[in-house]
Amino acid sequence: MQVEETSIEEIQTKIKRLNSKAGQMKMDLHDLAEGLPTDYTQLMDVAAATYEIYRQLDELKQELKKLENAK
């Protein structure tokens, strides 16, 4: 049971960090989109990085839900 608690806490900490990073990436993507066509060459890289952060966040949230339901 102690192992599960630690895992849940670790995942919650990772989710908090990723949420913060994801919010910043979302704002960066928004700022880049507002400035189009200037810096359009960066669009795909920023979009891909933003997608990856949100994919990781979704994965962690699903893992957390499984651990919480297993209690």
Swiss-Prot record:
Task: Kindly list the biological process annotations in GO that this record carries.
Answer: nitrogen fixation
Put simply, this protein is called UPF0437 protein asl1434
Which keywords has UniProt assigned to this entry?
Nitrogen fixation
Family, as annotated:
Belongs to the UPF0437 family.
Keyword Repressor in annotation? no
Q: Pfam family example for this protein?
A: Rop-like
Key word RNA-binding present = no
